[in-house]
């Protein structure tokens, strides 16, 4: 891990109003995501997405590519969580790794399924989130996966994302 002197927005001690608290949390998460990419050897990009495929945050990735990646990898996460195992039960996938000629892709469930599974504060109207990481082909897959888990522990307080609801729709 490198030792960056840069501090997260919350660590600066700047007082905020309740209206800007959500913005500060988002900035803190974005800072953690950028630091993760800077600190973990071989990792080149990271995207936090909603389970339904919307890009929430990224590590300064091209926005069009991050949007495309978010849509595709939410599908990967969905498929992985709907495969029955040897017990004939659907269980959440802890991690999916895709090995390509040009990169390694890692997908881990975040939010309720990883950070808040079985927690009594789970409320209706929330959607799971997913962390996607892109690494070089020679990256240490075990180290990248381990560091993703550590990042998700740091994200845990921020991981509940409201479900999108259209006009006239209600959350069911």
Language model region names:
Residues 1-45, 51, 55-172:
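Non-catalytic interaction/Regulatory regions outside core domains
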């Amino acid at each position: 891990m490198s030792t960056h002197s840069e501090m997260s927005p919350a660590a600066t001690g700047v007082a905020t109003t309740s209206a800007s608290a959500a913005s500060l949390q988002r900035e803190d998460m974005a800072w953690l995501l950028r630091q993760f990419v800077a600190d973990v050897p071989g990792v080149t990009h990271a995207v936090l997405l909603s389970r339904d495929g919307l890009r929430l945050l990224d590590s300064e990735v091209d926005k069009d590519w991050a949007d495309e990646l978010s849509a595709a990898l939410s599908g990967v996460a969905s498929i992985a969580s709907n495969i029955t195992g040897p017990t004939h039960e659907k269980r959440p996938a802890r991690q999916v790794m895709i090995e390509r000629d040009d990169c390694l892709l890692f997908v881990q469930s975040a939010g309720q399924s990883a950070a808040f599974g079985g927690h009594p504060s789970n409320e209706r109207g929330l959607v799971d989130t997913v962390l996607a990481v892109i690494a070089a082909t020679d990256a240490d897959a075990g180290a990248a996966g381990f560091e993703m888990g550590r990042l998700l522990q740091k994200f845990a307080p921020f991981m509940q994302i409201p479900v999108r609801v259209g006009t006239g729709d209600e959350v069911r």
